[in-house]
């Protein structure tokens, strides 16, 4: 099955300036992500960046770069620019791999592509079970609830679904009803073209979750349980130190 990986790599970061180029055991982080994408069997891998230094690092590692504008409001908008510049056909399967996930398993990159290809839907993603209360109540862990066919009903930073009877007795434990959304997406290129024509939705602004725009406009997102749990992503200096230790 043919698919393309696009890795958005925005240079500016409030908490970690120059994030794509931070060193992880002798390599820039973006090169680690590129290597994981290569292991997935993708037909083509493109790093989408707004900074020449990132482009040089990727090209030095033998990767392909697409220079994009610096003013995109979301990663999906950056993807849309690449889709147009590369003139991908509407049925091309695109997997969006975050540029700050150096420990992402190649298997789940492939999984989200396969998941999309097997369904008549424009967008697919992955989730993993939540087994502890700390994560269930953490607003940085985005929860998702599904219908009987595995399509997303809603994504939220809130604790959904709310286990009324269990939580009436205390908030120390959770049942087996929670899923944490992973920030990896598969799209058909034509869907990306449509997505960027839609105005941002109120729910998207409230939760700060751009995937809610898709549900707002009545489209479906299929969600599969990931075959592997990805390692730590890099958002802060503390995350960076953890990843360096785990990847030694």
Curated annotation (Swiss-Prot):
It is found in: Cytoplasm. InterPro entries: Cytidylyl_trans (IPR003329), KdsB (IPR004528), Nucleotide-diphossugar_trans (IPR029044). Keywords: Cytoplasm, Lipopolysaccharide biosynthesis, Nucleotidyltransferase, Transferase. Its EC number is 2.7.7.38. Its main location: cytoplasm. Activates KDO (a required 8-carbon sugar) for incorporation into bacterial lipopolysaccharide in Gram-negative bacteria. This is 3-deoxy-manno-octulosonate cytidylyltransferase. It comes from Shigella dysenteriae serotype 1 (strain Sd197). The gene is kdsB.
